[in-house]
Amino acid sequence: MPQFDLRGIQIAKYVNTNGVITYTDRQTAGDAMTANMELRYAEGRLYAESTLAEYMRKATGGSISLGVKYIPNAAQKIMFGSREKQRTVGQKQITGLVLGGKTTSAYVGVGMYAPDMIDGVEKFTAVKIAKALFGPPSMTLQTAGENIVFNTPTTTGEFLADDSTDQDMIEVAICDTEEDAIAWVTAALT
């Protein structure tokens, strides 16, 4: 499926209740720019009679990175465990976000969708990552020169099997309309 765009990245708090997985506090992760998900595998080979007799490959998790225009504060608090801190500057209260030695990231579910083309017909591929853990993005700042360079955040992390009996990692659905894809992502993160 050749995707040609990316839209609607959302995150939600991951909740495990005795193997029943639900999600709360669904939020946008920011205006979508890039998403990369790559599975990682455990592999095993058995040689017998001087030849490869058995081969096994099993998904164990993977890496994920999300690039967005900016990460909203509400999403940063859920994903990275950031906390708000207010400072008085003149007569104003300015609120910032703090990450520190006691800050702990939390597991989240991730959803998004991508318009694509299947046999000449536009469809929408919706994706859900069941359980992921992210770290705050690095900050790259530079002075303006002759050309304007936008530095946008990319957060990276790991995804792994959820705590259900099926141990889900990634779910993908092909939807006929953008409305269906949005509704699917919303339903997947509840």
Predicted regions and their residues:
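Glutamate identity and glutamate-enriched acidic tracts
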Residues: 38, 43, 49, 54, ...
